[in-house]
């Protein structure tokens, strides 16, 4: 397997994202209040109890679905395994999807009663970058597969 710049642009940010997800999402899946104390989750007084339930749902889903897929996909891709490419594509699809959902929710909730998110800027800076990386990663894996079929 050729380990060009694209390979590393998938692997390195992927591992950084995985470690961040374990810290920012897996821990709050067990204790949302711990996530609030760590600064990785928003408190109910800023986003309402419904907002907390929404963000907790993402944390729990990340714990049981996204984190395992991303970890297995990164390992399998690193090893050059076909199953790794399939699994990393599943994780990259989620990587593209969830930032879009979160940004849509932040926009839709702006004028909702009880929604007092102090600063949206981090959402609008980081989440589009994550979504773009996910979309790029899908394209890159497709390119890898096409090149593999030619050799």
Go through the PLM ranges and name each one.
Residues 1-151:
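Topology signature of small-to-medium multi-pass alpha-helical membrane proteins
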């Amino acid at each position: 397997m050729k380990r060009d710049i694209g390979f590393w642009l998938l692997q390195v940010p992927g591992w950084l994202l995985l470690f961040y997800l374990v810290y920012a999402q897996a821990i709050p899946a067990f204790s949302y209040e711990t996530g609030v104390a760590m600064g990785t989750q928003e408190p109910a007084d800023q986003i309402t109890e419904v907002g907390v339930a929404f963000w907790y749902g993402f944390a729990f889903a990340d714990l049981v679905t996204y984190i395992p897929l991303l970890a297995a996909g990164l390992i399998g891709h690193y090893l050059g395994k076909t199953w790794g490419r399939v699994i990393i594509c599943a994780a990259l699809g989620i990587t593209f999807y969830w930032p879009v959902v979160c940004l849509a929710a932040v926009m839709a909730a702006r004028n909702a009663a009880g929604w007092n998110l102090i600063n949206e800027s981090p959402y609008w800076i980081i989440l589009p970058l994550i979504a773009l990386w996910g979309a790029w990663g899908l394209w890159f894996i497709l390119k890898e597969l096409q090149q593999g079929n030619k050799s």
